[in-house]
Amino acid sequence: MVLERTLSIIKPDAVAKNVIGDIYSRFEKAGLKIVAAKYKQLSRREAEGFYAVHRDRPFFNALVEFMISGPVMIQVLESENAVARHRELLGATNPKDAAPGTIRADFAESIEANAAHGSDSVENAAIEVAYFFAATEIILR
């Protein structure tokens, strides 16, 4: 059994709706274990660094502003096929295209305020996890 880890961020819009517990319940029911978590207010520098890959995209500044507009819940999830399993739970980036019952279909307002972030590959997951968590902060379960 090969375990993967993925980074998940519950974004300010979903935090403001008080649905962290609902989302965590979905993770756990899908077999994703939470092995690290932080509730925090991102600084502009943290948000810009995390989304640096999008720096030249027209939505970059709006994305950064949104991500610093309120607290976020950041977690590392672990399971077999964690990246794909988490992305399936999230649904399409645009909640209008997300399948019913997915996190974005149920909790997101728009493509900009889409409730959650999930790593898009195992390679990016490793980079994203390391951006927010030291190895000593991840607890094996």
UniProtKB/Swiss-Prot annotation:
Alphabetical list of PANTHER family matching this protein: NUCLEOSIDE DIPHOSPHATE KINASE
Name of protein: Nucleoside diphosphate kinase
Role played: Major role in the synthesis of nucleoside triphosphates other than ATP. The ATP gamma phosphate is transferred to the NDP beta phosphate via a ping-pong mechanism, using a phosphorylated active-site intermediate.
Organism: Xylella fastidiosa (strain Temecula1 / ATCC 700964)
Chain residues that bind ATP: 11, 59, 87, 93, 104, 114
Enzyme's top EC category: transferase
Co-factor requirement: Mg(2+)
Quaternary structure note: Homotetramer.
Cellular component, GO annotation: cytoplasm
One example GO MF annotation: ATP binding
Catalytic activity: a 2'-deoxyribonucleoside 5'-diphosphate + ATP = a 2'-deoxyribonucleoside 5'-triphosphate + ADP; a ribonucleoside 5'-diphosphate + ATP = a ribonucleoside 5'-triphosphate + ADP
GO biological process, alphabetically ordered: CTP biosynthetic process; GTP biosynthetic process; UTP biosynthetic process
Subcellular location: Cytoplasm
Gene that specifies this protein: ndk
EC number(s) from the headed UniProt entry: 2.7.4.6
Cross-referenced Gene3D superfamilies: Nucleoside diphosphate kinase-like domain
Top-level taxonomy: Bacteria, Pseudomonadati, Pseudomonadota, Gammaproteobacteria, Lysobacterales
Record-linked NCBIfam families: PRK00668.1
HAMAP family: NDP_kinase (MF_00451)
